[in-house]
Amino acid sequence: MKKILQFFIAIILCVNVIAQDPHYTQFNAVPLTVNPAYTGNFEEDIRVAGNFRQQWISSVAPISTTSIQADGKIGYENSSKQRPISLGVLFMNDNSMNGTFVSNYISAAASYQITLDKKENQKLSIGLLASYCNRRMDFSNISFQQQFATGGYDLSLPNGESALSNMKAYGCISTGLLYNFSNDKKTSVFDFGLSVFHINTPKQSFLKDDKQYLPMRFSVQSNYNRKLQDKFSAGINLLYQNQASVNYLLMGVSASSQFGQDEKNKIGLGFWYRTKDAMSPYLFIDYKKANIGLSYDITTSDLKNGAKPLKSFELSLQWRGFRKSK
């Protein structure tokens, strides 16, 4: 009975999953997932980042999502000229029901940045992301009627559900714009971005329906960080996303304090709120060129009324390096 229940939950889950992309609370930890124009959008030469999200841990249909990105500027540092071109790669794995439904995404990103003023305080970037997605369903741990034999279920027998594995890979194109502003002393930094994912609305196949299309995802992002008096800083983060009938606003605030003599060493606390879904306390540490963040989702939607409270957490890591002195 439990396996039958898992099967129907998997079907319902997959119908919802194919209509929308995975999402993160700490969206700014792996920024290529929300806007390809963030490629190379940092002071150092190279950035490597990762985010692991475990969602609905206490349910029969847990979801885990892992993303890894690497991006950097192209060419050699020149004090008289900025390097406008950046390249990056993004890998994402989305795993539902302990491997029953798995999606793998591999993407290549590129961006071009122009300076809008002589002081180089304002910049505009355009980004492009080309992605390839492969999905599969594995029902090796779930029994079907066709597998019933003398003495019980024999999982080595065909399950008769060939359509479940009939999922073709697809490719898609995404693009975005990003505006950056910083004051002369770099104590105030702001960005605002717009992006559209899956512009070509690729065709997907699920079960016997070959008319499933991945809808476009529209995203708006904004981040503001301000260095306050002495050793304190504060930040505000906003993300709005809309895909088909699913839309939400994610808002975050944070405050940090410097520790030690290096101004890059900080420890901070924050709070995220995703409309109609969850609120998340957030802890992060910056040490030299590395950053680590941990957030925990507290469900505020109707899902909180279940027999067991649904638990979700995220762990993010980021490292930047190889910045050459001018």
Language-model features: locations:
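Subset of outer-membrane beta-barrel
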Residues: Q20-K326
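Active-site/pore-lining binding-face segments in mid-to-C-terminal subdomains
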Residues: A10-I11, F284
